[in-house]
């Protein structure tokens, strides 16, 4: 499927919620569409990535699939608000999400992606704050970032910047 056909199929199936977010569950439920999206996001990163890094929770679904497609490891990043790392030493990064709420990502200090080439994968970029937090976290662990791959993004200056620099692979961009 061409990128244009993929974008059209995606636009036909996506439903925007009342909060402005896209409901991606129908995409994940369509095996052909999901497979085509995973292939599109992985394209160009073959042999260039040791780990795919993705945030909890929906990013994990997509990130694990892209990692499998690339033959790479998967390094999940937890949202610390979920309280998983209660008794571990962690590296934390704090950011403001698209709703202007204070959030934090964290990984154990012995994170498996340390020093490895990584591809950042998420489902959708609203403001770029989550991706910027992932970048900051990866930089703390000396992980060379090979790129960013997402199903979709809202049109913002940071998105344009990443696209112009060739850092972002995105199936769909919305106004």
What would you call each of these model-derived segments?
Residues 1-49:
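Active-site-facing substrate-recognition patch
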Residues 5-6, 132-175:
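PRPP-dependent phosphoribosyltransferase catalytic core
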Residues 49-56:
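Short glycine-rich phosphate-binding loop at a beta-alpha junction
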Residues 50, 116, 146:
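Conserved acidic residues
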Residues 56-61, 127:
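Gly/Ser/Thr-rich loops at beta-strand to alpha-helix junctions
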Residues 62-71, 134-135:
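Short Gly/Thr/Asp-enriched flexible loops that form oxyanion-binding sites at enzyme active sites
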Residues 72-118:
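Short, glycine/charge-rich flexible loops or terminal/linker lids adjacent to PRPP-binding catalytic cores
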Residues 122-131:
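Acidic, divalent-metal-coordinating active-site segment for phosphoryl/phosphodiester hydrolysis
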């Amino acid at each position: 499927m061409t990128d244009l056909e993929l974008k059209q199929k995606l636009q036909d199936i996506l439903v925007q919620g009342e909060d402005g977010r896209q409901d991606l569950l129908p995409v994940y439920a369509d095996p052909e569409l999901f497979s085509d999206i995973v292939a599109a996001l992985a394209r160009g990163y073959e042999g260039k990535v040791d780990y795919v890094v993705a945030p909890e929770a929906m990013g994990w679904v997509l990130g694990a699939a892209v990692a499998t497609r690339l033959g790479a490891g998967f390094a999940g990043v937890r949202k610390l608000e979920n309280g998983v790392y209660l008794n571990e030493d962690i590296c934390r990064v704090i950011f403001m999400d698209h709703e202007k709420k204070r959030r934090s990502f964290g990984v154990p200090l012995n994170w498996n992606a340390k020093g490895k080439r990584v591809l950042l994968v998420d489902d959708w970029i609203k403001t770029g704050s989550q991706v910027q937090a992932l970048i900051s976290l990866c930089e703390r662990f000396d992980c060379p970032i090979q790129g960013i791959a997402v199903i979709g993004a809202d049109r913002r200056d940071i998105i344009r910047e990443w696209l112009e620099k060739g850092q972002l692979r995105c199936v769909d961009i919305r106004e």
